[in-house]
Amino acid sequence: MSPLPPSAEACRDELLNRLAREAYRHGDFTLASGRQSNHYVNCKPVSLSGSGLELLGLALLKYVEPDAVCVAGLTLGADPLVSAVAMAAAQAERTLNALIVRKQAKGHGTAAWLEGPLPPSGARITVLEDVVTTGGSSLKAVQQLRETGYLVTRVVTIVDRQEGGEEALNAAELELVSLYQLNQVAERARQLETET
Protein backbone atom coordinates (compact mmCIF):
# COMPACT_ATOMS: atom_id res chain seq x y z
CA MET A 1 0.00 0.00 0.00
CA SER A 2 1.37 3.40 -0.93
CA PRO A 3 1.76 6.03 1.79
CA LEU A 4 -0.85 8.73 2.12
CA PRO A 5 -0.23 11.96 0.25
CA PRO A 6 1.53 14.48 2.50
CA SER A 7 -1.28 17.04 2.81
CA ALA A 8 -5.01 16.92 3.44
CA GLU A 9 -5.62 18.60 0.07
CA ALA A 10 -3.46 16.04 -1.75
CA CYS A 11 -5.34 13.27 0.07
CA ARG A 12 -8.68 14.79 -0.97
CA ASP A 13 -7.50 15.14 -4.57
CA GLU A 14 -6.30 11.53 -4.68
CA LEU A 15 -9.64 10.33 -3.31
CA LEU A 16 -11.51 12.32 -5.98
CA ASN A 17 -9.29 10.76 -8.66
CA ARG A 18 -10.00 7.28 -7.30
CA LEU A 19 -13.75 7.90 -7.25
CA ALA A 20 -13.69 9.30 -10.79
CA ARG A 21 -11.69 6.33 -12.14
CA GLU A 22 -13.11 3.46 -10.11
CA ALA A 23 -16.59 4.44 -8.89
CA TYR A 24 -18.13 6.66 -11.57
CA ARG A 25 -19.83 5.49 -14.77
CA HIS A 26 -21.72 7.38 -17.49
CA GLY A 27 -24.58 5.64 -19.33
CA ASP A 28 -28.18 4.61 -18.64
CA PHE A 29 -28.79 3.35 -15.11
CA THR A 30 -31.58 2.59 -12.66
CA LEU A 31 -30.62 3.76 -9.17
CA ALA A 32 -31.48 2.13 -5.83
CA SER A 33 -34.15 4.83 -5.46
CA GLY A 34 -35.78 3.58 -8.68
CA ARG A 35 -34.86 6.75 -10.54
CA GLN A 36 -33.23 6.71 -13.97
CA SER A 37 -29.89 8.48 -14.41
CA ASN A 38 -27.03 8.99 -16.85
CA HIS A 39 -24.60 8.99 -13.92
CA TYR A 40 -23.81 6.04 -11.66
CA VAL A 41 -21.54 6.05 -8.62
CA ASN A 42 -20.65 2.76 -6.92
CA CYS A 43 -18.11 3.60 -4.21
CA LYS A 44 -17.43 -0.04 -3.29
CA PRO A 45 -14.40 -0.50 -5.60
CA VAL A 46 -12.78 2.31 -3.59
CA SER A 47 -14.27 1.61 -0.15
CA LEU A 48 -13.38 -2.09 -0.30
CA SER A 49 -9.72 -1.54 -1.20
CA GLY A 50 -7.11 -1.06 1.51
CA SER A 51 -5.72 2.19 0.14
CA GLY A 52 -9.23 3.50 -0.57
CA LEU A 53 -10.30 2.71 2.98
CA GLU A 54 -7.32 4.59 4.32
CA LEU A 55 -8.19 7.70 2.29
CA LEU A 56 -11.91 7.48 3.12
CA GLY A 57 -11.31 6.93 6.83
CA LEU A 58 -9.25 10.09 7.11
CA ALA A 59 -11.54 12.16 4.88
CA LEU A 60 -14.79 11.15 6.60
CA LEU A 61 -13.40 11.37 10.15
CA LYS A 62 -12.83 15.09 9.65
CA TYR A 63 -16.63 15.62 9.52
CA VAL A 64 -17.69 13.36 12.40
CA GLU A 65 -19.07 15.49 15.22
CA PRO A 66 -16.49 16.01 18.00
CA ASP A 67 -18.84 14.63 20.67
CA ALA A 68 -19.94 11.58 18.66
CA VAL A 69 -19.08 8.27 20.30
CA CYS A 70 -19.98 6.12 17.28
CA VAL A 71 -20.34 6.22 13.54
CA ALA A 72 -23.11 4.12 12.01
CA GLY A 73 -24.71 3.40 8.68
CA LEU A 74 -27.07 1.13 6.81
CA THR A 75 -25.57 -2.11 5.56
CA LEU A 76 -23.97 -2.70 2.93
CA GLY A 77 -22.66 0.59 1.59
CA ALA A 78 -21.73 1.98 5.00
CA ASP A 79 -20.12 -1.18 6.40
CA PRO A 80 -16.57 -0.46 5.20
CA LEU A 81 -16.99 3.27 5.89
CA VAL A 82 -17.83 2.92 9.58
CA SER A 83 -14.92 0.50 10.02
CA ALA A 84 -12.48 2.80 8.19
CA VAL A 85 -13.51 5.83 10.25
CA ALA A 86 -13.31 3.93 13.54
CA MET A 87 -9.80 2.77 12.57
CA ALA A 88 -8.71 6.28 11.52
CA ALA A 89 -10.04 7.61 14.84
CA ALA A 90 -8.09 4.98 16.79
CA GLN A 91 -4.92 5.92 14.92
CA ALA A 92 -5.59 9.55 15.90
CA GLU A 93 -6.06 8.40 19.52
CA ARG A 94 -9.79 9.13 19.51
CA THR A 95 -12.30 6.61 20.81
CA LEU A 96 -15.00 6.15 18.17
CA ASN A 97 -16.80 2.86 17.66
CA ALA A 98 -18.61 1.56 14.58
CA LEU A 99 -22.20 0.34 14.33
CA ILE A 100 -23.89 -1.37 11.40
CA VAL A 101 -27.63 -0.84 10.97
CA ARG A 102 -29.40 -3.84 9.47
CA LYS A 103 -32.06 -3.38 6.77
CA GLN A 104 -34.32 -5.58 8.88
CA ALA A 105 -34.08 -7.06 12.33
CA LYS A 106 -32.00 -10.20 12.62
CA GLY A 107 -34.33 -13.18 12.22
CA HIS A 108 -32.77 -15.17 15.05
CA GLY A 109 -31.00 -14.76 18.38
CA THR A 110 -31.48 -11.25 19.73
CA ALA A 111 -33.44 -10.00 16.67
CA ALA A 112 -31.12 -6.98 16.72
CA TRP A 113 -31.24 -4.08 14.26
CA LEU A 114 -27.78 -2.86 15.30
CA GLU A 115 -24.44 -4.67 15.25
CA GLY A 116 -21.41 -3.46 17.14
CA PRO A 117 -20.58 -2.08 20.58
CA LEU A 118 -23.74 -0.24 21.66
CA PRO A 119 -23.21 3.06 23.48
CA PRO A 120 -25.51 4.20 26.30
CA SER A 121 -28.87 5.73 25.42
CA GLY A 122 -28.63 9.42 24.55
CA ALA A 123 -25.17 9.11 22.97
CA ARG A 124 -24.44 11.09 19.81
CA ILE A 125 -23.89 9.07 16.63
CA THR A 126 -22.85 10.36 13.20
CA VAL A 127 -24.35 8.45 10.27
CA LEU A 128 -22.13 7.64 7.28
CA GLU A 129 -23.32 6.95 3.74
CA ASP A 130 -21.54 6.20 0.47
CA VAL A 131 -23.94 7.97 -1.94
CA VAL A 132 -27.00 10.10 -1.13
CA THR A 133 -29.72 10.39 -3.77
CA THR A 134 -33.11 10.69 -2.04
CA GLY A 135 -31.73 10.17 1.46
CA GLY A 136 -33.83 7.02 1.98
CA SER A 137 -31.01 4.75 3.20
CA SER A 138 -29.72 7.37 5.61
CA LEU A 139 -33.23 8.03 6.94
CA LYS A 140 -33.78 4.31 7.57
CA ALA A 141 -30.54 4.13 9.56
CA VAL A 142 -31.38 7.31 11.48
CA GLN A 143 -34.87 6.03 12.30
CA GLN A 144 -33.49 2.84 13.87
CA LEU A 145 -30.83 4.74 15.80
CA ARG A 146 -33.29 7.33 17.11
CA GLU A 147 -35.83 4.64 18.07
CA THR A 148 -33.05 2.97 20.07
CA GLY A 149 -32.51 6.22 21.97
CA TYR A 150 -29.51 7.77 20.23
CA LEU A 151 -29.00 11.39 19.22
CA VAL A 152 -28.42 11.72 15.48
CA THR A 153 -28.15 15.13 13.80
CA ARG A 154 -25.59 14.67 11.02
CA VAL A 155 -25.14 12.45 7.97
CA VAL A 156 -21.77 12.44 6.21
CA THR A 157 -21.65 11.06 2.67
CA ILE A 158 -18.91 10.50 0.13
CA VAL A 159 -21.04 11.72 -2.80
CA ASP A 160 -24.23 13.79 -2.82
CA ARG A 161 -26.09 13.33 -6.11
CA GLN A 162 -28.04 16.55 -5.36
CA GLU A 163 -31.39 14.93 -6.16
CA GLY A 164 -33.40 15.87 -3.08
CA GLY A 165 -31.52 13.92 -0.44
CA GLU A 166 -30.31 16.97 1.43
CA GLU A 167 -33.82 18.42 1.57
CA ALA A 168 -35.27 15.11 2.83
CA LEU A 169 -32.59 14.88 5.51
CA ASN A 170 -33.05 18.52 6.53
CA ALA A 171 -36.80 17.85 6.92
CA ALA A 172 -35.85 15.15 9.46
CA GLU A 173 -33.66 17.67 11.32
CA LEU A 174 -30.44 16.26 9.89
CA GLU A 175 -27.47 18.11 8.46
CA LEU A 176 -25.93 16.59 5.33
CA VAL A 177 -22.18 16.97 4.88
CA SER A 178 -20.69 15.63 1.64
CA LEU A 179 -17.10 15.12 0.60
CA TYR A 180 -18.05 15.66 -3.05
CA GLN A 181 -21.01 16.55 -5.24
CA LEU A 182 -21.85 14.30 -8.19
CA ASN A 183 -20.87 17.05 -10.64
CA GLN A 184 -17.35 17.18 -9.13
CA VAL A 185 -16.85 13.44 -9.60
CA ALA A 186 -18.28 13.53 -13.15
CA GLU A 187 -16.09 16.49 -14.11
CA ARG A 188 -12.96 14.82 -12.73
CA ALA A 189 -13.84 11.64 -14.68
CA ARG A 190 -14.06 13.72 -17.88
CA GLN A 191 -10.72 15.39 -17.13
CA LEU A 192 -9.00 12.07 -16.50
CA GLU A 193 -10.50 10.61 -19.68
CA THR A 194 -9.13 13.45 -21.82
CA GLU A 195 -5.67 13.05 -20.24
CA THR A 196 -5.38 9.43 -21.41
Curated annotation (Swiss-Prot):
Gene assigned in the entry: pyrE
Pathway: Pyrimidine metabolism; UMP biosynthesis via de novo pathway; UMP from orotate: step 1/2
Record-stated family: Belongs to the purine/pyrimidine phosphoribosyltransferase family. PyrE subfamily.
Assigned keywords, A-Z: Glycosyltransferase, Magnesium, Pyrimidine biosynthesis, Transferase
GO molecular function, one term: orotate phosphoribosyltransferase activity
InterPro entries: OPRT, Or_phspho_trans_dom, PRibTrfase_dom, PRTase-like
GO biological processes: 'de novo' UMP biosynthetic process; pyrimidine nucleobase biosynthetic process
Keyword Magnesium attributed: yes
Binding site for orotate: T133, R161
Organism name: Prochlorococcus marinus (strain MIT 9303)
Name of the protein described by the UniProt record: Orotate phosphoribosyltransferase
Function: Catalyzes the transfer of a ribosyl phosphate group from 5-phosphoribose 1-diphosphate to orotate, leading to the formation of orotidine monophosphate (OMP).
Reaction equations catalysed: orotidine 5'-phosphate + diphosphate = orotate + 5-phospho-alpha-D-ribose 1-diphosphate
Source species taxonomy: Bacteria, Bacillati, Cyanobacteriota, Cyanophyceae, Synechococcales
